[in-house]
Amino acid sequence: MIQVAMKLSQQLRLGEHRCDVIIAITHCRLPNDVKIANALGAVANTDPSKNGVDLILGGHDHEYYIGRGIESYEGSDFDTEMPGSENDENSFIIKSGTDFHDLSAVEITLSEPHPPTAVRRRTIEHVKGMYNVLTRF
């Protein structure tokens, strides 16, 4: 998955689309999302000279997880020490619950444009989120 994401990142950033930001939507277990985030630079203070993704919106686990790189998260307290998160290197990961019972609103702040030699024209400086409950049983 990492190799495919890297290839797509190169196409999206350097090809005809010239994307400033890439948001990956995954359906992985938390340890895999953490591994992907670390490998592809979906972390705070990422290197703008490297390809990769900027933010991961994850599913599959049916649990809420907020990566350690997320600056603030309103609406509830979440444990960033969940099993499978041990290797989280300040990731920009949001795993937003289960079966559309919960919803995350996400606000990202981008850097000023990087020099033309950078692969990532902009990087994420801050991520803020808000937890919303849609339904309760």
Predicted segments with their positions:
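Cap/lid and interdomain-hinge subdomains that line or gate substrate/regulatory clefts
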Residues: 1-6, 125
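Active-site-adjacent helix-turn-beta-strand microarchitecture at beta-sheet edges
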Residues: 34-137
